[in-house]
Amino acid sequence: MKILLANPRGFCAGVDRAISIVERALELYQPPIYVRHEVVHNRFVVEGLKQRGAIFVEELHEVPDNNIVIFSAHGVSQAVRQEAKQRDLTVFDATCPLVTKVHMEVARASRRNMEVVLIGHAGHPEVEGTMGQYSSETGGMYLVETPADVEKLKAIVKDPSDLHYVSQTTLSVDETADVIEELRRVFPDIQGPRKDDICYATQNRQDAVRELAGDVDVMVVVGSKNSSNSTRLKELAEKLGTPGYLTDCPEDIKPEWFEGKTKVGVTAGASAPEELVNQILERIKELVGARSVDEVLGREENMFFEVPKELQIKQVD
């Protein structure tokens, strides 16, 4: 049995930054440090931070007065920011800068009273945060997930000549392209971002799966089930005809995944740490009797996002 390891894989710059913000806050200010929503969608990472004193909550009212709260990498609405300000909470913002870019596009359109279409998955925290940047009372903001949803907008959009679209950053590149194509067919005057909103890490990891899927009999994606970008990697492998499995726990891997197979592909979503990838690899090697892992060459990534200045320098009492 041969095991092929995709590149690039695992942590992106936004996830790295978000985790560093929580770690630095714990180091500088001591526990408890409150985090609104899972800072990144990975059970392994979240459990590790909990053990160090981070407390994860879903709403700000769960954060006691006079405490520190960190906003997750997925971003938050303007209403959440306003609530934190009114309560005078100390806030560190771990929103991914690439998500912030989308927020700025929506806010700009809102100020101009343009209507906005967001391509994304309902209920995802990034979508909730992005929708929450829109405040125009005369315009409107609408969520679509599939090309079929676009047709329904014809009865809702007020001014098709002044319409803008943005997208969730962790979607399937192919699926987003299909929705954009349908938007442009139904609304020929629609405007979009100068550069695709799908983030570089999402694109790169999906490209790596495309390269690898044809060379393996099964694909194991390291990531949690609530991770959008990890789920898209599994779905992409399956779309390309390769059975895919999503896991964030070595014990969940089943021997039958590999029955009758000769080549296993392994990759990891942008919120999955290399430590977990290695644990998964060891489990697969144990199950299939492989001695080594062949790492596939891929696109080099050198993106880096700084943590807030307040967390960069050790503070002296």
Curated annotation (Swiss-Prot):
One of its GO terms (molecular function) is 4-hydroxy-3-methylbut-2-enyl diphosphate reductase activity. Isopentenyl diphosphate binds at H41, H74, H124, S227, S228, N229, S271. Disulfide bonds: none annotated. CDD domains: lytB_ispH. It catalyses: isopentenyl diphosphate + 2 oxidized [2Fe-2S]-[ferredoxin] + H2O = (2E)-4-hydroxy-3-methylbut-2-enyl diphosphate + 2 reduced [2Fe-2S]-[ferredoxin] + 2 H(+); dimethylallyl diphosphate + 2 oxidized [2Fe-2S]-[ferredoxin] + H2O = (2E)-4-hydroxy-3-methylbut-2-enyl diphosphate + 2 reduced [2Fe-2S]-[ferredoxin] + 2 H(+). Catalyzes the conversion of 1-hydroxy-2-methyl-2-(E)-butenyl 4-diphosphate (HMBPP) into a mixture of isopentenyl diphosphate (IPP) and dimethylallyl diphosphate (DMAPP). Acts in the terminal step of the DOXP/MEP pathway for isoprenoid precursor biosynthesis. Transmembrane segments: none annotated. Its EC number is 1.17.7.4. This is 4-hydroxy-3-methylbut-2-enyl diphosphate reductase.
